[in-house]
């Protein structure tokens, strides 16, 4: 079991869950002198609530056994009662009594083939777990326990064990446990109920396999987006956004979005020029192609063609997803090279510093990916959208700068011949990692709080004859979709002249 006292959950293996389950079964069996098979049925019937099982057995044992199907029932002795069993629309006929398997609480008999078909169709392969398994006869409520399953094939017994395990995980009323949703992962997360209301830690769960998921909805970690919005985004039928209101709006300052990392760069002129982003991509400000691709295009056509297709939410999502996968690959490559095969020149402290930095980049990339969803849902005010993209652009640029610094220092440390060459690294990177972590924490809090910095109370009232611009507080009529003062060319010119005058005076 992997447990950290600072975290409100534990990571358990499949074997540890099985041990806890069998211990619970044995306790009920020993205290109330019933078989392990009956104890298993009772716990499944009452959703693994040992306290409730104990109370019911102490109050009225016979009634509980009758309600759960663990009491013998009288069977109609008609000749057709065991010769033909109808299950919904299926009809199965038995030729004889050879190799028929019965249950201890009724006289219905079925062969192993029918048992397999019945269990797989109604219990093993259904999405919703059932509390208990009952007799295949529609009119019989006798419970099917492990003592009956033991008479079936080994394959059927293994399927039944997995079914009980699923019942313990998905139908448990007492323990807060969920299986890690990552593919091919058998780890189980047990959440400690005393810390359930702690929002600071209860949202994201980190499994030993490396997968990070939301405890509430079991989707991948989607901070700072809520569970409902994350589900709406992922369950969208086409994931294509055609409305122009969801695309990136041009601002009054000439800005260009990097096609690789989505950073916003300012352009000093309307003429095409080559810009160098913090991600080290050099591209044309007009066609948004890399310098090499731009030169090839210019040679073929004689000039570059302006890219008219805007960067939509889906485009931003895909770009951020690729960057996230690249960050994960960098982390896995470092762990494979330096942790599993440590070098004599690297201290354990140095390895952990680099690993923490790479892990932080993965987490920040995941946050930036889910921030793209905000642009999809946040359509209320244009200035709010501009401020949102401004925050996203700063976060992207800050993370890219940190990533470049970490990569440079990592290369220096890995190539260092003496420990003294790592002195600067040991002081710089931990501080930078802490700063980036704090920066993204504040960034997520800003988004989760609803971007209150760009909203004004006058917007929410809606009763006066004017609405006030949240940038310059100018009173606009409700017929105006944009602020007359902010988007007036003459007003912009006056502002520029005023700035020039102030600069000369100073």
Curated annotation (Swiss-Prot):
Organs and tissues of expression: Mostly expressed in closed flowers and, to a lower extent, in pollen.
Q: Which residues form the signal peptide?
A: none
Zinc finger regions, RanBP2-type: 462-492
> Which SMART domains has this protein been placed in?
IBR
Q: Is Transferase one of the keywords?
A: yes
In terms of SUPFAM superfamilies, this protein maps to: RING/U-box
Keywords associated with the record: Developmental protein, Fertilization, Metal-binding, Repeat, Transferase, Ubl conjugation pathway, Zinc, Zinc-finger
Q: Where are the zinc fingers (RING-type)?
A: 83-140, 258-287
As recorded in UniProt, its EC number(s) are 2.3.2.31
Report residues binding Zn(2+) 1. Answer: 106, 108, 135, 140
- Write down a Pfam family by its short name: UBA_ARI1
Which residues are Zn(2+) 5-binding? Answer: 284, 287, 294, 304
Which residues of this UniProt protein bind Zn(2+) 2? Answer: 180, 185, 207, 209
GO terms, molecular function: ubiquitin-protein transferase activity; zinc ion binding
IBR-type zinc finger segments: 158-227
Q: Which GO terms describe its biological process?
A: protein ubiquitination; regulation of double fertilization forming a zygote and endosperm
According to the record, the residues making up region (TRIAD supradomain) are 79-308
The record's comment on cofactor binding reads:
Binds 4 Zn(2+) ions per subunit.
Ligand binding (Zn(2+) 3): 214, 217, 222, 227
Q: Per the entry, which co-factors are needed?
A: Zn(2+)
Q: Where does this protein act, in terms of pathway?
A: Protein modification; protein ubiquitination
Positions annotated to bind Zn(2+) 4: 258, 261, 277, 279
User: What else is noted?
Assistant: Transcripts of KPL and ARI14, encoded by adjacent genes organized in a reverse orientation, have the potential to generate natural cis-antisense siRNAs (cis-nat-siRNAs) pair targeting ARI14 in sperm, thus leading to opposite expression levels during male gametophyte development.
Free-text domain note:
Members of the RBR family are atypical E3 ligases. They interact with the E2 conjugating enzyme UBE2L3 and function like HECT-type E3 enzymes: they bind E2s via the first RING-type zinc finger, but require an obligate trans-thiolation step during the ubiquitin transfer, requiring a conserved active site Cys residue in the second RING-type zinc finger. The active site probably forms a thioester intermediate with ubiquitin taken from the active-site cysteine of the E2 before ultimately transferring it to a Lys residue on the substrate.
UniProt similarity note: Belongs to the RBR family. Ariadne subfamily.
Protein name as annotated: Probable E3 ubiquitin-protein ligase ARI14
Q: What organism is the protein native to?
A: Arabidopsis thaliana
């Amino acid at each position: 079991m992997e447990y950290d006292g600072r975290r409100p959950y534990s990571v358990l293996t499949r074997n540890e869950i099985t041990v806890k389950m069998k211990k619970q079964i044995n306790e009920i069996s020993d205290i109330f002198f019933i078989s392990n098979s009956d104890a298993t049925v009772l716990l499944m019937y009452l959703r693994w609530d040992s306290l409730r099982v104990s109370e019911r057995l102490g109050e009225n044992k016979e009634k509980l056994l009758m309600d759960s199907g663990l009491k013998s029932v009288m069977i109609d002795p008609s000749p057709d009662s065991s010769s033909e069993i109808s299950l919904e629309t299926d009809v199965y006929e038995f030729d004889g009594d050879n190799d028929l398997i019965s249950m201890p609480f009724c006289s219905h008999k079925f062969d192993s083939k029918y048992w397999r078909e019945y269990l797989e169709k109604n219990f093993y392969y259904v999405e919703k777990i059932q509390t208990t398994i009952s007799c295949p006869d529609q009119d019989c409520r006798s419970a099917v326990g492990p003592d009956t399953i033991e008479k079936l094939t080994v394959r059927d017994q293994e399927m039944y064990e997995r079914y009980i395990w699923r019942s313990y995980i998905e139908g448990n009323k007492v323990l807060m446990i969920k299986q890690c949703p990552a593919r091919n992962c058998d780890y189980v997360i047990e959440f400690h109920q005393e810390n359930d209301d702690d929002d600071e830690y209860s949202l994201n769960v980190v499994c030993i396999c490396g997968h990070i998921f939301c405890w509430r909805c079991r989707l991948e970690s989607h901070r700072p987006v809520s569970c409902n919005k994350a589900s709406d985004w992922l369950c969208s039928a086409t994931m294509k956004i055609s409305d122009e209101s969801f695309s990136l709006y041009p601002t009054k300052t000439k800005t260009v979005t990097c096609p690789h990392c989505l950073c916003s760069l300012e352009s000093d002129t309307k003429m095409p020029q080559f810009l160098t982003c913090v991600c080290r991509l050099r591209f044309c400000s007009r066609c948004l192609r890399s310098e090499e691709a731009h030169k090839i295009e210019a040679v073929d056509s004689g000039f570059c063609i302006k890219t008219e297709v805007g960067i939509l939410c889906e485009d931003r999502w895909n770009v951020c997803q690729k960057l996230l996968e690249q960050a994960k690959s960098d982390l896995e490559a470092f762990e494979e090279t330096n942790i599993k095969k440590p070098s004599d020149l690297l201290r354990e402290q140095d390895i952990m510093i680099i690993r923490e930095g790479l892990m932080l980049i993965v987490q920040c990339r995941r946050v930036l990916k889910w921030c793209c969803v905000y642009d999809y849902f946040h359509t209320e005010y244009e200035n709010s959208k501009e401020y949102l993209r401004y925050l996203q652009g700063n976060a992207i640029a800050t993370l890219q700068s940190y990533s470049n610094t970490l990569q440079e220092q990592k290369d220096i440390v890995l190539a260092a011949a003496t420990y003294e060459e790592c002195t600067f690294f040991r002081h710089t990177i931990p501080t930078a990692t802490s700063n980036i972590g704090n920066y993204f924490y504040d960034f997520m809090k800003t988004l989760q709080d609803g971007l209150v910095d760009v909203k004004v109370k006058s917007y929410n009232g809606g009763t006066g004859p004017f609405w006030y611009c949240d940038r310059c507080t100018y009173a606009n009529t409700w017929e105006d979709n944009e602020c007359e003062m902010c988007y007036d060319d003459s007003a912009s010119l006056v502002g520029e002249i005023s700035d020039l005058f102030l600069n000369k005076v100073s």
